[in-house]
């Protein structure tokens, strides 16, 4: 399983219109990632946290994966998911995430101020914490806040697409990635492409060699695009399609699919399926620390 949790959707607000040319470019990017070995990809819709969201839940997600990318999924076997990234500046102007999270598989936060970072690392019910790696970080990243965020299950995202753009973006990317690795102590990191065109796509070997030179061990680089990234998908899907992350509605076909891989069955068939969760050694260590008497 090779996962990319960040392929940008060509729309920055609900008021923008998506052109067929932009969708075709996105399909080419997804096809390129499939050729490079990726099996699970999340399409990322980035919007400001203070923007007015539609009242109708059906209008919250403009991506519409089944209609736009159903043929691509059937032809290639790709598993596509929807993700929303909320740009957080002033927490007082934000809206509740309960309605938003119902429409997307993954919810991420992108703080651009110190207050936004504090809110993202403490109170928000999110799956991912990411940054604008082509710009300066909103504040100095402290071990205490970032590690507490990782300990409650939120993963940190590194977007390598900024390393393939202009000189200023590359310079800032190197500085920001080192800060994220330092503050998180190399824990809870996932890697996404942020690819806006097929030319910005890289395979796992190219990404590993890049991020390893910035301080992340090579074994954690492979986990960042595999096990940990799939855990983000699992947590996000279980938020809406389970009861206490144990029993989910949908599926039930008996073909062995789970809540991550059963992209359409969970939404189409209203039956009951039991999902067994497993924890790796690192997660078990965190759990034992939190439950010490």
UniProtKB/Swiss-Prot annotation:
GO MF annotation: an example: RNA binding
Pfam families in alphabetical order: RNase_P_p30
InterPro entries: Pol/histidinol_Pase-like (IPR016195), RNase_P_p30 (IPR002738)
Record-listed E.C. numbers: 3.1.26.5
Top-level taxon of the source organism: Eukaryota
Subcellular location: Nucleus
Reactions the enzyme catalyzes: Endonucleolytic cleavage of RNA, removing 5'-extranucleotides from tRNA precursor
Keywords: Hydrolase, Nucleus, rRNA processing, tRNA processing
Top EC class for this record: hydrolase
GO CC terms in record: cytosol; nucleolar ribonuclease P complex; nucleus; ribonuclease MRP complex
Keyword Hydrolase included in the entry's annotation: yes
GO-annotated biological processes: intronic box C/D snoRNA processing; maturation of 5.8S rRNA; nuclear-transcribed mRNA catabolic process, RNase MRP-dependent; rRNA processing; tRNA 5'-leader removal; tRNA processing
Known partners and oligomeric status: Component of nuclear RNase P and RNase MRP complexes. RNase P consists of an RNA moiety and at least 9 protein subunits including POP1, POP3, POP4, POP5, POP6, POP7, POP8, RPP1 and RPR2. RNase MRP complex consists of an RNA moiety and at least 10 protein subunits including POP1, POP3, POP4, POP5, POP6, POP7, POP8, RMP1, RPP1 and SNM1, many of which are shared with the RNase P complex.
Main function: Component of ribonuclease P, a protein complex that generates mature tRNA molecules by cleaving their 5'-ends. Also a component of RNase MRP, which cleaves pre-rRNA sequences.
Miscellaneous remark of the record: Present with 6300 molecules/cell in log phase SD medium.
Family: Belongs to the eukaryotic/archaeal RNase P protein component 3 family.
Protein name: Ribonuclease P/MRP protein subunit RPP1
Organism annotation: Saccharomyces cerevisiae (strain ATCC 204508 / S288c) (Baker's yeast)
Name of the gene: RPP1
């Amino acid at each position: 399983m090779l996962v990319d949790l960040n392929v940008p959707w060509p729309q920055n607000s609900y008021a923008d219109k998506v052109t067929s040319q932009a969708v075709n470019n996105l399909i080419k990017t997804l096809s390129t990632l499939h050729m490079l070995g990726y099996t699970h990809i999340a399409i990322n819709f980035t919007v400001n946290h203070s923007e007015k969201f539609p009242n109708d839940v059906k209008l919250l997600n403009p991506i519409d994966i089944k209609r736009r990318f159903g043929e691509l999924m059937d032809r290639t076997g790709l598993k596509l998911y929807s993700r929303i990234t909320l740009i957080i500046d002033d927490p007082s102007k934000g809206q509740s995430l309960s309605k938003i999270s119902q429409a997307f598989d993954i919810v991420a936060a992108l703080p651009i101020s110190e207050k936004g970072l504090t809110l993202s690392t403490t109170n928000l019910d999110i799956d991912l914490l990411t940054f604008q790696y082509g710009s300066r970080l909103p504040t100095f990243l402290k071990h205490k806040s970032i590690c507490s965020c990782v300990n409650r299950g939120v993963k940190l995202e590194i977007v390598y697409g900024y390393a393939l753009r202009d000189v200023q973006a590359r310079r800032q990317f190197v500085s920001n990635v080192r800060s994220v690795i330092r503050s998180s102590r190399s824990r809870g990191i996932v890697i996404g492409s942020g690819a806006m065109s097929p030319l910005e796509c890289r395979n796992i070997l190219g990404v590993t060699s890049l991020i390893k030179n910035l301080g992340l061990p090579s074994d954690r680089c492979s986990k960042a695009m595999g096990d940990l990234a799939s855990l983000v998908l699992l947590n996000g899907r279980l938020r809406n399609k389970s009861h206490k992350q144990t029993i989910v509605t949908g599926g039930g076909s008996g073909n062995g699919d789970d809540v991550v891989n059963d992209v359409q069955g969970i939404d189409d068939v209203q039956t009951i399926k039991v999902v067994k969760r497993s924890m790796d050694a690192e997660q078990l260590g965190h759990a034992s620390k939190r439950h010490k008497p």
